[in-house]
């Protein structure tokens, strides 16, 4: 391999909203960039063993790879000179609600306008939509033409985005919003809220309305500002292909608490290069200390399945027998439900499996919400749950992200999972702080059975420990007859519930 001269300078020039040019770097500088943007492909089935995130012919790279080059240069003592666009923060007074313990929202707005492309990483309940609304307000005040599109990926988030934007702009005279949803495409307004599934459907070969398709393509290509909510779930190859149709963008904002997923190296690279990478981030720990998020503890209940007689090795079969239909495990869950009901704690139980959700609903009589529940009924059950004193609700993964449920005191992650981003998103449902609530609890299961179940449980445990610390995580063995009393004491002490707790709430 040819030796690279460390003293050579990398010269980078912004040539468009989406690309940098590094051809003025000289031979050694070009080699540095090539090395920085060449990665080993972790997939054993990949056509190529390496991934290159630069154009070898044009000597360009996408905007999101700049920070990777700067990090490489710092680690290898290489000089970097960047000739970038000079964006100033608009001289508009930022909303006064973004102050005090919410100062991070002001900082996020300012960081965005210095770059105009990138990801803002704020923990769940940190005010991502609030930040987007203020960025939108400034855009509407400083840009007298050009349209804004806010993309979500489910009905609940769509409805919540509309409500949040409407409430935010009420002090500014309101906001006229168009919709792209369930086959309906109204792009006549300056601001549009869309479901990505509807956009995909209209652009697909299944859509026979050529006029609608043509109008949507024209709208997307002429769009000036794109905002993608929960981008970690909205960056598949098919969705990125749609975003890249938007050649006229001058602003691009992505929102997420967990933009990059563990074990998804290739997809993370694709998201990074397209999005502009992270431009602002604040931690859950800081927001807890400021009182934006509630303090919380984690309780994990160990369930030992090793004595279970199960000869099948298929993972889906094991999941059904040992998790969804397990009398032992469901018995532990039912006892937990009984304890929390007696204490009057508002509890959300989250399920990955709708089948499991139905089983528990039939056993307990607790209402449930899933993707099969109509939009109106979903909102009605959610409102009834949040407005009630105490109470319980079962919900599928449609509630794992974005949905505002600040009144919830206890979250039970019923059927686990591996992905740390999902664990972080789920626990975010319970971390909201209100005038009457400043403490929360997450309850999960540690399933002891073969390598997959143990590893998945351990991964979630590590995610909790990394988030809140060892001292705030309790693990109880449900095989120990004293676990019920221990769990009661932990929950009672954390929420300051008296011994005669049925009369306390």
Language model: regions and residue ranges:
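Post-DEXD/H (motif II) to motif III coupling segment of the RecA-like Helicase ATP-binding lobe
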Residues: 225, 230-297, 464
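Conserved helicase ATPase core of P-loop NTP-dependent helicases/translocases
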Residues: 159, 175-188, 348-350, 355-359, ...
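Conserved pre-motif I regulatory segment
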Residues: 52-53, 75, 81-121
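Conserved helix-turn-beta segment of the N-terminal RecA-like "Helicase ATP-binding" lobe
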Residues: 148, 155-183
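Walker A/P-loop
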Residues: 115-139
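Conserved RecA-like P-loop NTPase helicase motor core
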Residues: 371-466
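Conserved interdomain hinge at the start of the Helicase C-terminal
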Residues: 310-362
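A conserved SF2-helicase RecA2
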Residues: 276-295, 307-310, 421-424, 432-503
């Amino acid at each position: 391999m040819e030796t690279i001269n460390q003293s050579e300078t990398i010269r980078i020039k912004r040539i468009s909203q989406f690309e940098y040019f590094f051809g003025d770097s000289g031979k050694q500088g070009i080699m540095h960039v090539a090395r920085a943007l060449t990665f080993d492909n972790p997939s054993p089935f990949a056509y190529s063993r390496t991934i290159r995130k630069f154009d070898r012919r044009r000597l360009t790279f996408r905007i999101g790879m700049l920070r990777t080059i700067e990090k490489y240069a710092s680690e290898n003592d290489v000089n970097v000179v960047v000739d970038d666009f000079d964006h100033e923060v608009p001289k508009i007074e930022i909303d006064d609600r973004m102050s005090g313990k919410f100062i991070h929202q002001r900082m996020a707005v300012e960081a965005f306008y210095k770059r105009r492309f990138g990801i803002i990483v704020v923990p769940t309940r940190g005010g991502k939509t609030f930040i987007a609304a203020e960025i939108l307000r400034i855009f509407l005040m400083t840009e007298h033409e050009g349209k804004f599109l806010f993309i979500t990926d489910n009905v609940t988030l769509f409805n919540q985005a509309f409500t949040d934007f409407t409430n935010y702009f009420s002090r500014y005279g309101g906001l006229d919003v168009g919709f792209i949803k369930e086959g309906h495409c109204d792009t006549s307004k300056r601001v549009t809220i869309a479901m990505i599934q509807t956009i995909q459907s209209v652009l697909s070969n299944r859509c026979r309305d050529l006029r609608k398709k043509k109008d949507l393509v024209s709208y997307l290509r002429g769009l000036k500002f794109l905002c993608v909510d929960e981008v970690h779930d909205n960056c598949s190859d098919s969705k990125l292909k749609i975003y890249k149709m938007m050649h006229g963008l001058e602003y691009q904002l992505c929102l997420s608490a967990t933009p990059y997923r563990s074990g998804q190296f290739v997809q993370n690279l694709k998201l990074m290069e397209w999005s502009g990478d992270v431009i602002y981030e604040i931690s859950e720990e800081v927001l807890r200390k400021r009182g934006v998020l509630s303090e919380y503890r984690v309780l994990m209940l160990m369930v030992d399945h090793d004595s279970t007689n199960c000869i099948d090795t298929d993972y889906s079969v094991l999941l059904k027998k040992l998790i969804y239909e397990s009398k032992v495990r469901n018995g532990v869950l039912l006892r937990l439900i009984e304890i929390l009901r007696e204490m009057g704690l508002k509890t959300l139980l989250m399920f990955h499996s709708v089948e499991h959700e139905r089983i528990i609903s039939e056993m307990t009589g607790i209402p449930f919400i899933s993707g099969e529940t109509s939009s109106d009924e979903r909102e009605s059950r959610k409102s009834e749950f949040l407005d009630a004193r105490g109470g319980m609700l079962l919900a599928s993964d449609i509630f794992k992200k974005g949905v505002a449920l600040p009144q919830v005191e206890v979250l039970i992650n019923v059927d686990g999972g591996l992905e740390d981003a999902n664990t972080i998103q789920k626990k975010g449902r319970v971390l909201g702080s209100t005038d009457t609530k400043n403490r929360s609890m997450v309850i999960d299961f540690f399933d002891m059975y073969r390598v997959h179940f143990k590893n998945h449980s351990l991964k979630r445990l590590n995610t909790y420990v990394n988030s809140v610390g060892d001292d705030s995580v309790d693990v109880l063995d449900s095989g120990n007859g004293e676990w019920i009393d221990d769990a009661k004491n932990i929950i009672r002490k954390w929420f300051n519930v008296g011994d005669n707790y049925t009369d306390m709430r």
